[in-house]
Amino acid sequence: KAKCAEIDQDCKTSCDCCKGACTCY
């Protein structure tokens, strides 16, 4: 799985990090 560089970013990329949780598509 890919890692997200930052938390709470825009959440419109292939790897979303929102509210402390990351979801990679």
From Swiss-Prot:
Pfam families attached to this UniProt entry: D_CNTX
Keywords: Disulfide bond, Knottin, Neurotoxin, Secreted, Toxin
Record flagged with keyword Secreted: yes
Tissue localization of expression: Expressed by the venom gland.
Compartmental location: Secreted
Superkingdom in the source lineage: Eukaryota
Cystine crosslinks: 4-18, 11-22
GO cellular component labels: extracellular region
Residues passing through the membrane, by range: none
Complex formation: Monomer.
Family: Belongs to the neurotoxin 03 (Tx2) family. 06 subfamily.
Name the UniProt record assigns to this protein: U11-ctenitoxin-Co1b
Native organism: Ctenus ornatus
